[in-house]
């Protein structure tokens, strides 16, 4: 801790916090000393909150013990998090969000977690209703206020949204890893279902060959409503069980278990209905659930007595304090009690899922909601709020709904008050549902590994684009697509897809696309929506199963997609106990490398053990989108090609399917293997992967209209100078497609390649380096472009050189980045005195150097720029009705008379005249 006259500072390895000793205002700085955020007004506690329209506090009713604080927002700052908020975008800047369940909107899990693209996060520590005004009332301020309770919050810093989620996970606790079967398909029966109806629903899945694991019952299974105060029993008519023999294979639960199903029961969350009454749970209330768990129940669905939609719109009196006492953490407390009680009773992980949640719910339960028009936004919003297990009831009667429903962290069909069952669909939709269900079960090892990543790092299974591509300005605004794990890009309820930089494969057709690109996608008949696989992806798959665990995990398919380096970590455990949290887990690292003439895959040894782990296994390696290889080696030994059925191929052999462009080989593996297994695939031609058709290539180009080569070259230059990778590579791809179409020979291709390299040379020289110093490792630069190189080789070379130039600029910290940091500081601290020397010190620069570069880039001197921004801000405030004194204070003028003189000199009128 450092104590200074004006402030005190507390520092860690990743951040430092400064407190103004006069005002109490906080400023958070990153590890490099850059300002991340600051309070631009002293916090207020215990003195009430400002009155809203009509004289009542808009956050939570008038009170004398509320709180308020606010932080400055930078000009380009993006804000994410705040839980599941219907009808709000993923990026919350410009929104006003109440952290409560009853606010006129359908809210399932309000989480008071705010994540900033500037590298800082904030978590409120309160269980009272409060409100975030994220640049809605004032565009450059985030204001947090509540009507009751004390002001308490956590501030943390990180290198990006992913690192901030990890910090949140460390702060609140890791997400639970659900039982492996919970990541399959779940089906909730109609609320009027009987035991016979439930069994019939289950057997329909088996008869039709549709994989499914979980069958759920609504709370109507009981003889009376569960109130946490006494015993309940099965409904005597609809779920009759002989009291003299309540357990065993002869019961309806036993019949379900024999067919591979797991039963979950619905419970209503407690709702006392009295304003201000605490929802205290009786001690040891889990005892009332023990008999059902002993009979084989494996999970519980925590329901609300009335649907969330109706609850949201229930009228609330102006002076009703039940809103504030609604006990936001109630479902978290109930979920924790069940999870701990169930674990003590059985040693197994339960499947607990609830429609409402709050901070910390991720440690005990999954979250679900009813049908929504844009279900994926709820899933992505909670993923950005530290809750990785969110599912929205599948929209069963549309192809797009099935597509999105199966690519959620967990998949759920909810019949509830309706008749939703896949066997009631028309034949085409039924076939589509079956296709997706089987794919989901094949992907279970991939999904389950992503769940382990979520528990360890906070990175969700369904990942919003800003989380994965934070530096791509076009990617961060995409709301109708997301990454499912690290390999799959899913587009939901749209045929417009943006592919970030790199190569991508259409999962349904096998065609290759190159990004960055905007695509108008045509969904094949056998699919429900766009699905792409990233080049370099490694995807483990199970064989076909009707339910998780039906077959031992001793044979796994490993699908690999060339086009880049990739890695994947496979996490395996027993799938049902808590052993994974005590080290009973096996971890396998798999990497692939894509060199010019050799594609390699390395299978690391399994590290760790778990009960009943197979002692040996076979990897069925499937490499996609290849031309037929010249040779295949495993651990240095050449394998021979074989033809015919791949079900029982001879040892040490491989086969190639020309129609699908896939290479297959079976690689045996044992537990005690100390070293990695290395696969080397020597490619026969000049192309690493199959080329896409001309129709697909034209679809993958960004829609930029008719551009000349000169215009595209200017775009490339701008992208290289500003470090905008997406802009540079997009323009380069278009430029090359035009030039390649004109090329009639290898010499023509070489000329175009040299022409672009001359542009690269000029760019490198402006950075004070030669092109060989920046990108001398490029094979084509070394070899001077030989005659056997193809047009695709040439384009790949140019794209790699462009990427290296941009990366070099980022590493060196170019002028553009320095000036951007300086202007960000100015705009975020416009209400303070700003000097060139102070900002230069914070950026670790010489003030003369900063002054010179500022004038070169901005066109104004530092002092003129600051004055312009202060005067424009003052004008905005005055025209909005601010007093002269307030406008002076909020633009950093401590002397109002001096402010008057400066303002009049700048605008030609006094502040008072401007205001009137």
Task: Kindly give the residue locations of the regions a language model identified.
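Accessory, solvent-exposed terminal regions and/or long lumenal/extracellular loops of proteins
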Residues: 535-637, 657-693
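Catalytic-domain carbohydrate-binding cleft regions of carbohydrate-active enzymes
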Residues: 33-528
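Beta-strand-rich N-terminal accessory domains
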Residues: 1-43, 498-501, 518
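Short, well-ordered beta-strand segments enriched in hydrophobic/aromatic residues
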Residues: 8-14, 489-491, 598-609
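Sequence-specific DNA-binding recognition helix
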Residues: 839-843, 847-848, 854, 880-915
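Inter-domain helical "communication" segments and dimerization helices
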Residues: 687, 692-834, 838-846, 860
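Terminal helix-turn-helix DNA-binding modules in bacterial transcription factors
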Residues: 823-828, 837, 856-894, 916
């Amino acid at each position: 801790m450092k104590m200074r006259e004006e402030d005190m500072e507390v520092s860690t390895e990743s951040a430092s916090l400064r407190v103004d000793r006069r005002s109490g205002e906080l400023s958070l700085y990153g590890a490099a000393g850059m300002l991340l955020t600051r309070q631009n007004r002293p916090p207020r506690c215990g003195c009430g909150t400002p009155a809203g329209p009509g004289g009542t506090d808009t956050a939570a009713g008038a009170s004398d013990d509320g709180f308020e604080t606010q932080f400055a927002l930078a000009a380009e700052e993006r804000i994410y998090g705040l839980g599941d908020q219907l009808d709000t975008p993923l990026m919350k800047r410009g929104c006003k969000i109440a952290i409560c369940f009853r606010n006129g909107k359908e809210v399932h899990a309000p989480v008071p977690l705010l994540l900033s693209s500037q590298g800082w996060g904030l978590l409120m520590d309160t269980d009272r209703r409060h409100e975030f005004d994220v640049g809605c009332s004032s565009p450059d301020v985030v204001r947090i206020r509540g009507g009751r309770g004390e002001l308490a919050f956590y501030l943390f810093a990180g290198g990006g949204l992913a690192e901030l989620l990890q910090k949140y996970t460390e702060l609140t606790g890791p997400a639970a890893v659900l039982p492996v079967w919970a990541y399959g398909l779940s089906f909730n029966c109609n609320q009027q279902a009987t035991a016979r109806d439930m069994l019939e629903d289950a057997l329909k899945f088996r008869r039709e060959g549709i994989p499914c694991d979980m069958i759920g019952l609504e709370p109507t299974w009981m003889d009376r409503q569960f109130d946490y105060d006494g015993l309940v029993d099965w409904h005597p008519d609809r779920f009759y069980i002989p009291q003299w023999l309540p357990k065993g294979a002869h019961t309806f639960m036993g019949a379900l278990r024999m067919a591979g199903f797991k039963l979950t029961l619905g419970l209503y969350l407690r709702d006392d209905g009295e304003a201000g009454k605490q929802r205290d749970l009786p001690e040891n209330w889990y005892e009332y659930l023990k008999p059902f768990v002993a009979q084989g129940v494996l999970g519980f669905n925590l329901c609300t007595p009335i649907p969330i939609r109706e609850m949201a719109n229930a009228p609330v009196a102006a002076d009703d304090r039940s809103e504030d006492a609604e006990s936001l953490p109630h479902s978290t407390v109930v979920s924790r009690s069940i999870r701990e009680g169930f674990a003590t009773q059985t040693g197994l992980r339960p499947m607990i899922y609830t429609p409402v949640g709050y901070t910390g719910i991720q440690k005990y339960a999954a979250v679900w909601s009813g049908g929504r028009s844009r279900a994926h936004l709820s899933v992505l919003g909670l993923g950005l709020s530290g809750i990785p297990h969110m599912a929205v009831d599948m929209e069963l009667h549309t192809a797009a709904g099935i597509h999105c429903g199966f690519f959620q962290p967990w998949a759920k069909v909810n019949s509830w008050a309706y008749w939703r069952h896949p066997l009631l669909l028309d034949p085409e939709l039924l076939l589509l549902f079956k296709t997706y269900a089987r794919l989901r079960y094949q992907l279970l090892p991939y999904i389950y590994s992503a769940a382990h990543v979520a528990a360890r790092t906070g990175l969700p299974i369904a990942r919003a684009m800003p989380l994965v591509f934070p530096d791509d300005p076009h990617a961060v605004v995409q709301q109708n697509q997301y990454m499912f794990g690290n390999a799959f890009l899913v587009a939901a309820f749209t045929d417009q897809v943006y592919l970030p930089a790199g190569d991508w494969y259409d999962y349904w057709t096998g065609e290759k696309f190159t990004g960055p690109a905007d695509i108008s996608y045509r969904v094949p008949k056998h699919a429900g929506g766009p699905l792409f696989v990233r080049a370099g992806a490694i995807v483990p798959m199970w064989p076909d199963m009707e339910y998780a665990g039906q077959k031992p995990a001793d044979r796994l398919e490993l699908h690999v997609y060339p086009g880049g380096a990739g890695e994947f970590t496979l996490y395996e455990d027993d799938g049902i106990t808590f052993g994974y949290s005590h080290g009973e887990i096996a971890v396998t690292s798999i990497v692939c490398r894509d060199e010019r003439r050799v594609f390699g895959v390395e299978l690391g040894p399994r590290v760790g053990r778990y009960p009943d782990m197979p002692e040996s296994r076979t990897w069925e390696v499937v490499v996609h989108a290849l031309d037929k290889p010249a040779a295949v080696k495993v651990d240095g030994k050449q394998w021979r090609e074989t033809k015919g059925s791949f079900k029982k191929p001879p040892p040490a052999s491989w086969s190639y399917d020309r129609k699908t462009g896939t290479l297959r080989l079976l690689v045996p593996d044992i537990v005690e293997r100390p070293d990695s297994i290395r696969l080397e695939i020597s490619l026969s031609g000049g192309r690493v992967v199959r080329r896409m058709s001309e129709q697909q290539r034209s679809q993958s180009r960004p829609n930029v209209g008719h551009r000349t080569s000169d215009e595209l070259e200017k775009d490339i230059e701008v992208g290289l100078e500003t470090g905008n990778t997406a802009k540079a590579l997009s323009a380069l791809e278009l430029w090359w497609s035009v030039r390649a179409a004109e090329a009639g020979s290898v010499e023509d291709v070489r000329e175009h390649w040299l022409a672009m390299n001359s542009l690269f040379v000029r760019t490198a020289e402006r950075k004070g380096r030669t092109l060989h110093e920046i990108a001398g490792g490029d094979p084509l630069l070394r070899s001077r472009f030989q005659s056997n190189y193809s047009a695709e080789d040439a384009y790949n070379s140019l794209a790699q050189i462009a990427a290296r130039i941009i990366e070099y600029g980022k590493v060196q910290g170019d002028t553009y980045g320095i000036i951007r940091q300086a202007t960000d500081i100015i705009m975020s601290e416009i209400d303070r005195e700003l000097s060139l020397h102070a900002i230069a010190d914070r950026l670790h620069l010489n003030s003369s150097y900063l002054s010179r570069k500022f004038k070169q880039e901005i066109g104004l001197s530092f002092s003129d720029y600051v004055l312009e921004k202060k005067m424009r801000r003052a004008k905005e405030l005055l025209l909005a009705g601010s007093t002269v004194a307030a406008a002076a204070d909020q633009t950093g003028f401590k002397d109002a008379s001096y402010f008057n003189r400066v303002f009049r000199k700048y605008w030609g009128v006094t502040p008072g005249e401007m205001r009137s």
